[in-house]
Amino acid sequence: MKEIMAIVRPNLVKKTTDALSSVGFPAMTMTECFGRGKQKGYFAANMPDVVDMEKVIKEGKEMGLYLKYIPKRLISIVVEDADVPLVVGVIMKINRTGKHGDGKIFVLPTEETIRIRTGETGDIAIGN
């Protein structure tokens, strides 16, 4: 089993979750988070859910408040090893714009999964 952690733009979460559900992966956890890559933050007029990266890069300081960390969403999904390429591919297809801020995907080993309600373990407990 693997845990796939994807940090994506907030405006692409619905498209991403809909696409994952459509290929058989409706079970996931989402968290609001803030982060940055090498760009070291951006300027924005206020604290929106979605930052227009092209406008930020063009206008810079003229936009107002400096955002050291950009609003993002973390999607976490545990899948069987064989499903990793499919899930990663779906996430990449929806979230790759080719611009700074597209996000990151981490694939981590998961030793065990236990469904609390039933006590089921392993792949059965994943629920996909």
Which role does the model predict for each range below?
Residues 1-128:
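Positively charged, small/polar-rich N-terminal and surface patches that mediate targeting and assembly
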